[in-house]
Amino acid sequence: MTSNGTNGSATAYHASSTQEAIQAENDFAAHNYHPLPVVFARAQGTSVWDPEGRHYLDFLSAYSAVNQGHCHPKLVAALVDQASRLTLSSRAFYNDVFPKFAEMVTKYFGFDMVLPMNTGAEAVETGIKIARKWGYKVKGIPENEAIILSAENNFHGRTMAAISLSSDPESRENYGPYVPNIGCTIPGTEKPITYNDKAALREAFEKAGSNLAAFLVEPIQGEAGIIVPDDDYLQLARSLCDQHNVLLICDEIQTGIARTGKLLCHEWSGIKPDMVLLGKAISGGMYPVSCVLGRKDVMLTVEPGTHGSTYGGNPLACAVAIRALEVVQEENMVERAEKLGQAFRSGLEAIQNPIIQTVRGKGLLNAIVIDESKTNGHTAWDLCMLMKEKGLLAKPTHQNIIRLAPPLVITEEEIAKALEIIKAAVAELPNLKGAAEDKVVPPPEKKVKITLEN
């Protein structure tokens, strides 16, 4: 029987080959993703193996969910131990792990209270609902008139509220009507609230007036292509929120948990939001966990029966999340991300190939912008296909931007190997033609268009 890349036998629920997995997904699953054609069968740390046993370095980290590395043994142990004891109680009853998680996570990040959910999109929805509650009950906004604003090119998820905030046409097409009074345009105009545009932000607050309940923002825009704002952008947002009695909500679902060289990315600006949204790496990729952290007076606007989740705060999730956060501290991942991120960006800049137009990022959340006018007809997708052949996995966003975000356990040697692969791939790409091109980029993978990818 095929080993399935796992040093053991495949089971009935493991595809026995890359071809079988891709064909079955194409036949039986909705086509809402276009994955890079590689199949994960086993992973450890920064390493991934496909069913045939081929090895790759993971430079996406499940969109920064596996900051602690794939299948971290301490997280596996926490998961197995709790799974054999108690997995789910619902919030109809107390369990003996959620209270420990609630105390730990609030102290760990320096907030008063937490509301647990499961996915990042649920955390966004919860934050929006809490902000509206606060707007009506505390600020005194007239019923059904609360406004929630975000910035252009944001990514806050795929739910109706999230796409109502979005400016991405593909995310919104044929999903209307959208949730009213939330968006990323200046109220009363069609002008976007351009990210990192301080004048646009001031105008948005002025035009929204007293009905503005919250401004929701990513400290670094991830899906937009790792857009790092000026140091004073979040400082201005904090100041405007204070002046106008508005809640500042930071979406740290992708940027948080040590990814950018700070525990939370907004710390780079020296500000503190009223609410923080967390997900992804809060559980190290072991289990869906998310939460909203905030001030006590804000969080207590939500009364029993007005919001919840059957799985939110379940003991299995909480046990894994506690251990995941402990591992971040024990293994100095904040410091590692900052040090190794600087080295990685320096290495990317040293490649000095005109195909790499821009290098940007913080910590180990980075991106290269590909100048497709210099690739001899190839795309960033083609470059990712070529890097895959050489053993490195990454994906484009917004067509010509490649996000590079490995697990924070990556070693200096693995970074050096990744830089070698990237350098070789950008040098080889313009000359990739004929049979060699068809081998690397087979017909189904040609002319692939990628906008948002999460």
UniProtKB/Swiss-Prot annotation:
Cysteines engaged in disulfide bonds, as pairs: none
Keyword annotations: Aminotransferase, Cytoplasm, Pyridoxal phosphate, Transferase
Keyword Transferase found: yes
GO biological process, one term: arginine catabolic process to glutamate
Subcellular location per the Swiss-Prot or TrEMBL entry: Cytoplasm
Gene Ontology cellular component annotations, sorted alphabetically: cytoplasm; cytosol
Enzyme Commission no: 2.6.1.13
NCBIfam families (alphabetical): Orn_aminotrans
Listed name of the protein: Ornithine aminotransferase
Organism of derivation: Emericella nidulans (strain FGSC A4 / ATCC 38163 / CBS 112.46 / NRRL 194 / M139)
